[in-house]
């Protein structure tokens, strides 16, 4: 094992991500910075930190307790809430916010106010004469949200960024990335399945910063005329050759010094080896492709045997004094 490489596996404070200090401090990944908290004060495993009601609220199943009707029974939906007893504050990742109410939740600022993408909770906060709407981001449905709540040091996705998203599926996480990069950013969303692709195209009709690409990510040359150079690649493809897939796309579209965020599902790569061995093997493959991993983080308790690896592509050479 390389010196300075200490992947942050397993142990988390409290309930891991929700406990007193979500990510477990220590040195983040490949000699990266410290993994700071990221966890919330919520209780139990219900989505954004609440009782057992689906998306993380109490019995009504919502993330925001600020007026509005109670849901029907456990886990019922509550509609758009007015944020009287709710406070939204910026997370340390630019473009991501924490909604503090009776329970805390991770949220993003809705690019298309009034529109819910996958039935997620929304909350409106009055700022002067304006109302700003935020959307709850469930870490059990999004690897990126799980990584943020687990205390990942950097996601490199921020307002104005151009992001290539491989394995976009129906666009659950893509919609939140679209919120983060905002009107000045772009999300190129690549998905091979035509059924999911239909959802993605419908999503892009309302969110003009999403460009859906219904193609196989193994063949970036087929869509090279659709995509400009990007700042970040996010990959959630769950394929045995996923590092090769990401590398092919990085060589074609990722600028030198750009970053990658890869979600690794150990079972999809080698179901016979331990998760730690699979992660270490994938990291080695990345290093052979001019991809320099800087941080590794497991996604417990939200996903089992998953890890996220964050790194830089073709970093500029260090200047010797």
Swiss-Prot record:
Its main location: nucleus. Changing residue 102 to R: Decreased acetylation; restores ability to methylate histone H2A. Ubiquitinated. Ubiquitination leads to proteasomal degradation. Deubiquitinated by USP36. Residues 274-306 are annotated as: Helical. The modification N6-acetyllysine is found at residues 102, 121, 205-206. The modification Phosphoserine is found at residues 116, 124, 126. Coiled coil: none annotated. Transmembrane segments: none annotated. It catalyses: L-glutaminyl-[histone H2A] + S-adenosyl-L-methionine = N(5)-methyl-L-glutaminyl-[histone H2A] + S-adenosyl-L-homocysteine + H(+); a ribonucleotide in rRNA + S-adenosyl-L-methionine = a 2'-O-methylribonucleotide in rRNA + S-adenosyl-L-homocysteine + H(+); a ribonucleotide in U6 snRNA + S-adenosyl-L-methionine = a 2'-O-methylribonucleotide in U6 snRNA + S-adenosyl-L-homocysteine + H(+). Residues 1-87 are annotated as: Disordered. Its EC number is 2.1.1.-. Changing residue 102 to Q: Mimics acetylation; impaired ability to methylate histone H2A. One of its GO terms (molecular function) is TFIID-class transcription factor complex binding. S-adenosyl-L-methionine binds at residues 172-173, 191-192, 216-217, 236-239. The keyword S-adenosyl-L-methionine applies. InterPro entries: Fibrillarin (IPR000692), Fibrillarin_CS (IPR020813), SAM-dependent_MTases_sf (IPR029063). It holds the Pfam family Fibrillarin. The modification Asymmetric dimethylarginine is found at residues 8, 15, 21, 24, 27. Residues 7-70 have a biased composition (Gly residues). GO terms for biological process: box C/D sno(s)RNA 3'-end processing; osteoblast differentiation; ribosomal small subunit biogenesis; rRNA methylation; rRNA processing; snoRNA localization. GO terms for cellular component: box C/D methylation guide snoRNP complex; Cajal body; extracellular exosome; fibrillar center; granular component; membrane; nucleolus; nucleoplasm. It is found in: Nucleus, Nucleolus; Nucleus, Nucleoplasm. Component of box C/D small nucleolar ribonucleoprotein (snoRNP) particles that contain SNU13, FBL, NOP5 and NOP56, plus a guide RNA. It is associated with the U3, U8, U13, X and Y small nuclear RNAs. Component of several ribosomal and nucleolar protein complexes. Part of the small subunit (SSU) processome, composed of more than 70 proteins and the RNA chaperone small nucleolar RNA (snoRNA) U3. Interacts with PRMT5 and UTP20. Interacts with DDX5 and C1QBP. Interacts with NOL11. Interacts with PIH1D1. Interacts with RRP1B. Interacts with NOLC1. Interacts with SDE2. Interacts with NOP2 and NOP56. Belongs to the methyltransferase superfamily. Fibrillarin family. S-adenosyl-L-methionine-dependent methyltransferase that has the ability to methylate both RNAs and proteins. Involved in pre-rRNA processing by catalyzing the site-specific 2'-hydroxyl methylation of ribose moieties in pre-ribosomal RNA. Site specificity is provided by a guide RNA that base pairs with the substrate. Methylation occurs at a characteristic distance from the sequence involved in base pairing with the guide RNA. Probably catalyzes 2'-O-methylation of U6 snRNAs in box C/D RNP complexes. U6 snRNA 2'-O-methylation is required for mRNA splicing fidelity. This is rRNA 2'-O-methyltransferase fibrillarin.
């Amino acid at each position: 094992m390389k010196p300075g490489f200490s992947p942050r596996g397993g142990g988390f404070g409290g309930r891991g991500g929700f406990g007193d200090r979500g990510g477990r401090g220590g040195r983040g990944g490949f000699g990266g910075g410290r993994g700071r908290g990221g966890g919330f004060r919520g209780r139990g495993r219900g989505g954004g930190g609440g009782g057992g009601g689906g998306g993380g609220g109490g019995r009504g199943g919502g993330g925001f307790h600020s007026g509005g009707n109670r849901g029907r029974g456990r886990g019922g939906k509550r509609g758009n809430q007015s944020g009287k007893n709710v406070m939204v504050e910026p997370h340390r990742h630019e473009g991501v916010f924490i909604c503090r109410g009776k329970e805390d939740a991770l949220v993003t600022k809705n690019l298309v106010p009034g529109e819910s993408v996958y039935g997620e909770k929304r909350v409106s906060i009055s700022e002067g004469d304006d109302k700003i709407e935020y959307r709850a981001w469930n870490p059990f449905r999004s690897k990126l949200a799980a990584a943020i709540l687990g205390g990942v040091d950097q996601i490199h996705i921020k307002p104005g960024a151009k992001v290539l998203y491989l394995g976009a599926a129906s666009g659950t996480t893509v919609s939140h990335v679209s919120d983060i990069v905002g009107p000045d950013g772009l999300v190129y969303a690549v998905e091979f399945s035509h059924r999911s692709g239909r959802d993605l195209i419908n999503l892009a009709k309302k969110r003009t910063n999403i460009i859906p690409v219904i193609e196989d990510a193994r063949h970036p040359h087929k869509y090279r005329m659709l995509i400009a150079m990007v700042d970040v690649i996010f990959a959630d493809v769950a394929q045995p050759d996923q590092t090769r897939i990401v590398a092919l796309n990085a060589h074609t579209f990722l600028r030198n010094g750009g970053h990658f965020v890869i979600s690794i599902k150990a079972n999809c790569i080698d179901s016979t080896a331990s998760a730690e061995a699979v992660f270490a093997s994938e990291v080695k493959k990345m290093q052979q492709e001019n991809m320099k991993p800087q941080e590794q983080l497991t996604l417990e308790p939200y996903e089992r045997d998953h890890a996220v690896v964050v790194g830089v592509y073709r970093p500029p050479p260090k200047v010797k004094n």
